[in-house]
Regions:
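Hydrophobic/aromatic ligand-binding patch that stacks against planar heteroaromatic rings
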Residues: 26, 51, 127, 147-148
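Phosphate-binding/switch loop-helix module in NTP-utilizing enzymes
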Residues: 73-133
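Sensor-1/coupling segment of RecA-like P-loop NTPase cores
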Residues: 129-145
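Phosphate-binding/switch region of NTP-binding enzymes
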Residues: 142-169
Length: 169
């Protein structure tokens, strides 16, 4: 990678996180530093966390949510607490961009924060605007957030294919 670039991986299909992480790992292999911040994700299995620890210091993973359950399964009170934690994660992302702490920043499932009303499109735009000249930013999530498309370099929409069953003849 050379220069500033911003990518969105969106849609209802599987593989958005894998695609962004794959690009991040490729860049880490080229000597770049990568930060992955996860939002709205259930707590990962212990094996997944061990894998990410082996990628350090080139790839660093951060989660600010404290509850192991999916956000939608939390009580209203727990969701309020979790929103504060998520906002801390957003502030961390802003700081990472402001000081140029990494070459590649992956904000996993951040697009879903707009659907839940936790983050506005304007706040997302300010994150995009904060991307430095030599930073690559990946935004993932189910939400298409088409309002952001004019401000990014690449949009990849993943859709899980529908396979029509046919009767054997």
């Amino acid at each position: 990678m050379s220069g500033r670039s911003i990518h969105i991986f969106c849609g209802t299909g599987m593989g958005k996180t894998s695609a962004a992480l794959g690009k991040g790992i490729r860049e880490a292999g080229l000597g770049k530093s990568v930060i992955l911040i996860q939002f709205l994700k259930e707590k990962q299995a212990e094996g997944s966390m061990d894998f990410f620890k082996r990628l350090e210091p080139e790839v660093r993973l951060f989660r600010f949510e404290k509850f192991p359950e999916n956000y939608d399964c939390l009580t209203e009170r727990e969701q309020e607490d979790e929103v504060r934690n998520i906002k801390n994660g957003l502030n961390f992302a802003k700081k990472v961009l402001a000081i140029g702490e990494c070459d590649v920043l992956i904000l996993d499932e951040i697009l879903g924060l707009t659907e839940k009303g936790i983050v506005t499109i304007d706040e997302m735009r300010s994150l995009i605007d904060a991307v430095g000249d030599d930073t690559e930013l990946f935004l993932t999530g189910n939400c298409r957030c088409e309002e952001l498309w004019p401000y990014v370099d690449e949009v990849t929409e993943l859709v899980t294919p529908y396979k029509k069953e046919t009767n054997a003849e």
